[in-house]
Each structure stands twice: as structure tokens, then as C-alpha cells.
């Protein structure tokens, strides 16, 4: 009777990249909502939310050279419209009555209180910085570092490599 699964996209422990698209297809075939922890995936993988088809994907901005205290949550519109906010605050509520409350339109429905404007501007610059390098170049460089690290560590008999990140 599983309703929701939460999985990581890229493990910061083993380097394993989970097949999110395939996992999502299987989960959706059973009516299960898929939430992906993309904190490691965001800065290291080429992401296409339409292709992955997960219901939610969370990214931590500081993992992408952005400010701390800020994150991004991608959510499918059908879920964002359907689910209530987890907290309330100014700017997100349209109307309060004795017996009901109505929330603003997306994305305001989930923007409680004062937005962290400086952090959002800083994160925009982080994205531009990463885009100037190019995700393909980042992936290529990381692959070269992994191959070099594995080559050096395999020569050390005191080290046992676990996993095979790519």
C-alpha cells in the first residue's frame, strides 16, 4: 500500500546514479508518487524534469555554489494545486473566513512570508556561472577526476574501493 517513495538521484556516499526515469515509470504504474532528493544531482547531472517525470525534485542551492538557506522544489502542477501548504504566512493567502481559507495562485501558494530576495539573486548568478561552464564540461571533468582517483587508489593495497561511480 505504498503511496509515496523518496529516493536520491545521485549518492554522495557511493557516487551511484539511480535510474530515476525507470523507477518513476514503475512507481507511477502502481499509482505511487515519486519524490527525488536531487541535492547532489542538481549540480552534477543534466536534468530534464519532463523526461524524468518524477512528481517532485528537490535541490539545495548551496550545492550549486549558491547561498545557504535556499532551495528549489520542482513539483508537477497537479500536485502543487492539490496539496495544501505546510505553513502559512503573508502573501500566500487570498482570503480567510471563519470556516475556510483560500490560498493564492501558484507559486504564491507556497511562498510564506518575505522572500529571501538577496539569496534568490545570488542563486541566479550561480546558475549563470554553471551555465557558462556547461554541464557537459562539468560532467567530463568529473569523469576525468573519478578515473584518475580510481587509478591512483587501485595502486594502494591499503585501500579497498567500494562501488564504481561513473
Where do the protein language model's features map onto the residues?
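Pyridoxal 5′-phosphate
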Residues: 1-166
